[in-house]
Design a protein with these regions (language model features):
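Intrinsically disordered, low-complexity N-terminal extensions of AAA+/P-loop NTPases
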Residues: 1-48
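Interdomain "pre-motor" coupling segment immediately N-terminal to P-loop NTPase/helicase cores
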Residues: 55-112
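N-terminal pre-Walker A segment at the start of P-loop NTPase domains
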Residues: 114-148
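Walker A/P-loop nucleotide-binding motif
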Residues: 148-167
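Post-Walker A helix-loop "phosphate-sensing" segment adjacent to the P-loop in P-loop NTPases
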Residues: 170-182
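Structural recognition of the conserved hydrophobic beta-strand(s) that form the central parallel beta-sheet
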Residues: 183, 216-218, 247-253
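Conserved nucleotide-sensing/catalytic segment adjacent to the nucleotide-binding pocket
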Residues: 194-246
């Protein structure tokens, strides 16, 4: 602990010393601390240098001085074995910033704009009443998770905000439930999987995605699908998530009927309706078909 002499070295006079001590103990924060802790005279005497240090650090903090080194922390007074000491606690601003970082760290976006990490259900504009049913379902899912497990298959016209809505859902799941979500642009994922065939990394890619705590497949149906992708990639992911009861969400420009037609297009124009229905059975099990109404917001 610093000596009073070191702190008051520029005040050699006894009268100056007493005057400075009086200034220190009359400081509103210091006076409140002395009263709260019921400091004895001996404890008070041992604490003068720390009180002085506290006042100096507090004033730097309040002024936002550039030489204040404990950025994001504010000085506070605490008791330390019979005398006052200076400690530091996180500011509300730092706590909020750290919370937001933690929220974003639980959001994994693959081939989607980073700006989607800023989406939240609180930002959803409900001036268009067509968005209200989807908002209510997402809000309910967040409130009731993990008891509720079935996801949503969100379809609608181009540009109505489907990706924003599912990103907002993921953000609120992270913020309010501490849940990690993987959001991936499905057409780009299909390309990545095809490119991984050469290096034998397909299984690792599929395993990583299928095990996500919450999985959101964005823009399904827009990919250049093949029977192999449909049966050996997508179906494997969906089957695993069915078995493990893992929440799964989708966005698409297609409704269920049109998506089935998309999957039924086989090699060389063959009709593979039966294979397509197998995939659709799993999607229907995992997610409720819901249309997002609204104007093109792009």
């Amino acid at each position: 602990m610093e000596s009073v002499g070191d702190v008051l070295k520029d005040h050699p006079s006894r009268f100056q010393y007493q005057d400075l001590v009086q200034q220190i103990v009359k400081d509103p924060d210091v006076a409140a601390f002395i009263q709260k802790e019921s400091l004895s005279q001996e404890e008070l005497n041992r604490s003068i240098s720390k009180f002085n240090q506290y006042i100096t650090e507090r004033d730097k903090f309040l002024r936002g001085d550039t030489d204040y080194i404990a950025r994001g922390y504010k000085p506070i007074l605490v008791m330390n074995h019979g005398y006052a000491d200076v400690s530091y606690e996180e500011t509300p601003e730092l706590i909020a910033a750290e919370k937001e970082v933690a929220i974003k760290n639980r959001l994994r976006l693959i081939n989607l704009p980073a700006s989607l990490t800023k989406a939240s259900l609180a930002q959803v504009e409900l001036d268009d009443l067509g968005r209200l049913p989807v908002f209510e379902k997402f809000f309910t899912f967040v409130e009731q998770y993990p008891e509720v497990r079935k996801g949503l298959y969100l379809y609608g016209d181009f540009g109505v905000g489907k990706s924003f809505m599912v990103a907002a859902l993921a953000h609120d799941l992270s913020e309010k439930r501490g849940v990690s979500s993987t959001l991936l642009h499905y057409p780009s994922f299909v390309i990545d999987v095809k490119n991984a065939i050469g290096d034998g990394n397909v299984k690792n890619l599929v395993d990583e995605i299928k095990q996500a705590e919450v999985l959101i497949l964005d823009d399904i149906g827009a990919e250049q699908s093949t029977p192999w992708v449909r049966d050996e990639v997508l179906q494997v992911i969906l089957q695993y998530r069915m078995q493990e009861d893992l929440p799964t969400f989708f966005t698409s420009n297609f409704n269920f009927e049109d998506l089935e037609k998309h999957f039924a297009k086989g090699k060389n124009g063959n009709d593979e309706t039966w294979e397509a229905r197998r995939v659709m059975e799993r999607i229907r099990y995992l997610a409720e078909e819901t249309r997002l109404e609204g104007e093109n917001r792009r």
